[in-house]
């Protein structure tokens, strides 16, 4: 969730009867997220100070000293402070009681780990996923971009590229997606069944 920019947008979209669950493991970002929610008077955002991954427990977070939005679960080098943060899975968090309609992920290459921890959620709900796709970071998290896409397709998701320059969303295959990401580029994808 970082400091809540998208959480506030989604909270407005879901209205008073909807809920936004905003996960942010970094203590300082979490403090700013809570402050942002309070100052904007949103009662339908539930902040959770945990990272979403493939298991519940603890994980090392390599904390960026330059940019509060690029903390990672792998060591990317550079000046980093290591902190230990709590983790959860969406399967455990929802516990068959919360039925998400939309999941937004921009977790610096850890998206495959998060998907691995939400298999029940994906199977039981007709969920839409908005996700960052950054092959370089996915590899640093010890999986392959193809494995991530294949996992999503195995649940029946169609992959769509969000072309921000052209302001359009269009279906895309894996090889075309990888061509767009050449040179270390990260893009956003929309996944729908």
Over which residues does each language-model region extend?
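Phosphate/nucleotide-binding beta-alpha loop and adjacent structural elements of enzyme active sites
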Residues: 1-193
């Amino acid at each position: 969730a970082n400091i809540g920019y998208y959480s506030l947008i989604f909270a407005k979209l879901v209205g008073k009867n909807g809920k936004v669950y905003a996960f942010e493991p970094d203590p300082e970002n979490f403090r700013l997220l809570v402050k942002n929610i309070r100052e904007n008077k949103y009662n339908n955002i539930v902040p959770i100070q945990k990272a979403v991954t493939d298991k519940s427990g603890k994980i090392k977070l390599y904390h960026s000293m330059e940019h509060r939005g690029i903390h990672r679960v792998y060591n990317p080098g550079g000046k980093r402070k290591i902190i230990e943060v709590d983790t959860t899975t969406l399967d455990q968090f929802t516990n068959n009681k919360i039925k998400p309609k939309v999941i937004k992920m921009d977790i610096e290459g850890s998206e495959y780990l998060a998907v691995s921890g939400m298999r029940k959620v994906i199977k039981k709900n007709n969920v839409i996923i908005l996700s960052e796709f950054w092959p370089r970071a996915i590899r640093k998290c010890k999986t392959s971009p193809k494995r991530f896409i294949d996992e999503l397709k195995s649940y029946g998701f169609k992959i769509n590229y969000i072309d921000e320059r052209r302001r359009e969303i269009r279906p895309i295959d894996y090889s075309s997606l990888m061509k767009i990401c050449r040179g270390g580029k990260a893009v956003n994808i929309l996944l729908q069944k």
